[in-house]
Structures are given as C-alpha cells and as structure tokens.
Amino acid sequence: MKMNYEELKTANATPAAASMVETFRAMGYSLETAMTDILDNSISAGANNIWISRIWKGGQSIITIKDDGIGMNHQELIEAMRPGSQNPLEERSKSDLGRFGLGLKTASFSQCRRLTVYSKKADYKPVYWTWDLDYVAKTNQWELLQWIPDEYINALDDVSHGTLVIWSGLDRIINPETSEIDINSKVKFSSLLDNVKRHISMTFHRFIEEKVVRIFWCEHEIEPWNPFCENEPKTQIRPTENIIGGISVKGYVLPHKVRSLAKQPMLKQKVLMDGQLSKDSMYIEEKDYF
C-alpha cells in the first residue's frame, strides 16, 4: 500500500540523549574490540602509521590513538561524531571497514565518558570536538563541546594530516576515584592494555605483514602474530576450498603437543594467546582488502 505522507499528522520522537548514550555504552564491546574498532577507522582513512599511547594518572588516566590518515575538516569531523553518520545501504569502498557510522562512538562510549577527536586535513586548520557524557546527562541534548585537554593541543604538529582520538574518564576500565599511587590498580591497568596489544597483533596481522600499516604501542612497533603459524615447520596447511559467494576456506592443523617451543616462537605465542594448542578456532578475514 502506498502511503500519502502529506495527509498524515506527525509527532517528534527524537531519542532522549541521556538515555540513548547509556544504551550505546552497553553494546557488548570489550576493551580489545573497542580499541580495534578505532584502529579500523584509521586504516579506512588511509593511515600508514598508527600510534597508541597510555598515560597512567589513576582515575584520570588517558588512552590515545593517533594516525596519519587523511584527516577531517570541521564539517567532516562533526559528521563523524554524529551517531549513525553512515547509511549501511550506501556503497562502500573495499578499504572501508565500517558499516553503520556508529563504531567510533559506541566503541569509545563503552570504555570512557569523554571522547575527544582532534583532526587535521591537508590545507585545513586542525579542529577538535568532544562528546562528554556527563554534559549529555546534565542537558539531555545531542551537543558536542569544543574542548581538548591542554596537553594535546600541539599533538598533530608532527603530521601534515591525521587524527587523534583521546579517551578520558575511563570509568569502564578504572574506578574514577583511583589514586595515581595505587600500585595494584596501575598493574591491573597495564595488564589489561597488554592484552589489547596482543589482540591487535593478531587482529591486524595481515595488515602488518602486507605493510599496509605500521602500528606503534608506546613508541614500540607491534609485530604481527599470525594465528595460523604458517611459518612453523610442523604446521599442516590444507588446500584452499572455494564455496558459494566467493568465500574461500583454508585449514591449518597445528601440532597437537607442545614440543620444542623455544625453537618454535609462533607456537609459543599461540600457547600464550589461546592457552592451548588443541583449541579449535575459526577466523574470518576480508581478504579482498589487500
């Protein structure tokens, strides 16, 4: 049945901002998947280098992700900060790893109460905007704040174009009341982020191996970790099978028992990552990207 919208009454049903952002915070992200979602954006923006930093300040600790991608101008940044900024029905380039225009916001909100994005596009002035969930809760409005921590105002001076994502108010990672001298909390914070580093080395191993991007963790370059252990002598590689829809399946059989791990570093890392060699796993990769 064809609708004649001009003859119908309407009512505004704009979602309440304070309630909606709390819903965004509960979309099932772990710290690992949240940070890799941000890295997806950097790669989609054509970054050759990504720098990840963590600054311990107790409950005021900060995590930053900086890239040398194409960057954004003022209007582009506001659009990127808008929830649902991308229509999933629109055609995407094969290098675009996003889909709904929610990842930057939902991934960040799942871990922190304050998301600042500072970006510089070639031939444009640097721009920054912040989502502050405490401000949203207070005003119940979808309003950004033009604010950036003072210590980061010159953070893009060393790149001609790029973007810096700043997470502060990390209430899902650390108690806001935590003291900077709390050693146990500092160790826990470091341990959580070490897990993220390992996750990144696995999730983006193809990108790193193919030299699509270099990822630096606290100034040290992350090495790729290939979960298939293809270069290990005792790994059995099965023939590739092509199935419906252009999907190909390839099997890898790793040694059942842990032997001579010192001589087989990838297997040793497999034990550290998975906990056991006998664990069956399936990995889905967007191979056409490369």
Regions found by a protein language model. Name each.
Residues 1-58, 75-78:
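Bergerat-fold GHKL ATPase/HATPase_c domain
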Residues 48-50, 59, 113, 161-163, ...:
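Residues at beta-strand starts and edge strands
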Residues 55-57, 68-70, 112, 120-122, ...:
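An acidic- and aromatic-residue-enriched active-site/binding cleft used to recognize and process polar
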Residues 73-75, 169, 174-176, 224-226, ...:
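Short helix/loop capping segments that flank catalytic or ligand/cofactor-binding pockets
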Residues 90-219:
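GHKL-type ATPase core
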Residues 185, 189, 197-198, 208-290:
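GHKL/Bergerat-fold ATPase module in large chromosome/replication-associated machines
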